[in-house]
UniProtKB/Swiss-Prot annotation:
Protein name: Non-structural protein 1
Annotated region (RNA-binding), positions in chain: 1-81
Subunit structure: Interacts (via C-terminus) with host IRF3; this interaction leads to IRF3 degradation. Interacts with host IRF7; this interaction leads to IRF7 degradation. Interacts with host CUL1 and CUL3. Interacts with host BTRC.
Highest taxon in the source lineage: Viruses
A biological-process GO annotation: symbiont-mediated suppression of host NF-kappaB cascade
Free-text comment on this protein's domains from its UniProt entry: The integrity of the zinc-binding domain in NSP1 is important for degradation of host IRF3. The pLxIS motif targets host IRF3 for degradation; however phosphorylation of NSP1 pLxIS motif is not required for its activity.
GO CC annotation terms, alphabetical: host cell cytoplasm; host cytoskeleton
Function: Plays a role in the inhibition of host innate immunity by inducing the degradation of key host factors required to activate interferon production such as IRF3, IRF5 or IRF7. Associates with components of cullin RING ligases (CRLs) including CUL1 or CUL3, which are essential multisubunit ubiquitination complexes, to modulate their activities. Recognizes the host NF-kappa-B regulator BTRC through the presence of a DSGXS motif in the C-terminal substrate recognition domain.
InterPro entries with a match to the protein in the record: Rotavirus_NSP1
Amino acid sequence: MATFKDACYYYKRINKLNHTVLKLGVNDTWRPSPPTKYKGWCLDCCQHTDLTYCRGCTMYHVCQWCSQYGRCFLDNEPHLLRMRTFKNEVTKDDLMNLIDMYDTLFPMNQKIVDKFINNTRQHKCRNECMTQWYNHLLMPITLQSLSIELDGDIYYVFGYYDDMNNVNQTPFSFINLIDICDKLLLDDVNFTRMSFLPITLQQEYALRYFSKSRFISEQRKCVSDSHFSINVLENLHNPSFKIQITRNCSELSSDWNGACKLVKDTSAYFNILKTSHVEFYSVSTRCRMFTQRKLQIASKLMKPNYMTSNHRASATEVHNCKWCSTNSSYIVWNDFRVKKIYDNILNFLRALVKSNVNVGHCSSQEKIYECVENILDICDNEKWKTSVTEIFNCLEPVELNAVNYVLFNHEVNWDVINILVQSIGKVPQILTLNDVVTIMQSIIYEWFDIRYMRNTPMTTFTVDKLRRLCIEPKTVDYDSGISDVE
């Protein structure tokens, strides 16, 4: 059993404040939620289990029991998960406030310990102090946290997480912030708490405390598209698709790390809870992470033979050709922007090949085909520029005054002509490597200008950010028929 979950279950009975703050979905009646196979720690109840996606940020960080309350660490309501979540620079004072909150919600004194022990001994065969019967008393106060970085903001979700060596498929990593705090002071707090326990339980408490307070922090993970709900990923190829999220909100102070101090003033805490409400947001999928996913899928479906073909149709409209036909059944082609990029990139590359290399049919096998594998994935800038350079070198460029040039005298479509004029000011007859890079960047940036995209989706924004964007409004994309340039 998860220690934190057990502690919340037993301690919520001691007073009104605890009954409100320590209420967890995992300790209440179970309500079904979408089953998944993502393994990790539920941020709400701290148990290691199968996770489902959060309705507030669409990431997998909540168990199927706790999902019924829809709590997210990015909420603006002072529930326990939010009060345990700290942001960016964490000071020693912040950590002391956190320790005070733990001590307030999970007090340890002789009266409390005797009460729990007496209640437990009322059951048969429970006269011995076995750990499974007193798990709720064996939760030490530590600075163990699960941390994540979202577009420059670092979040620390403190709690007591058992079995740190278990499989973790979430983007959260274990970070120990004890170096910021006074170790001796934290030791003293826990030794004082431990002194009220029976001797047989003190050893287990000490082992748990030192194992969770002296561990080495993990390397912070990178958030990827696989960490978000499969429902979102399956709809990325619909340009008009919007992600629906809900956030628990209240009139909480803008002092993010100060939320944990609310439990010291019970009346103020309950006054804030009276303002609690749910806010709904419809946000765009637009971000580098999801854009890269779409472009990578299209790259895997690319038919490079089109570069040497004589087809009059655009690359995605070629049918009944063994070497050039694309499989139109893939949902990535539902996004007309991906189709436009695919068509224009191959149209431009075909013009380069036809202008410089003596090839005549799409059935021919050319070395240049090996260079286009990453040509759409501009999000990985280093690999992308390497691919463009390799393609340029395959065109047998001519050196003049230490600069390499290739010819450009083959027809292109009107879309590419417009991009040529916009990017380099004219329709040229010779091109340098820099010209080719600029033109190909412009073809992709016309629809997906990653230079101005955030890395993660807007579902990872705080409530304050979402509210500001709603006022402007920028929570939804532009009309689906308008490009980034327009």
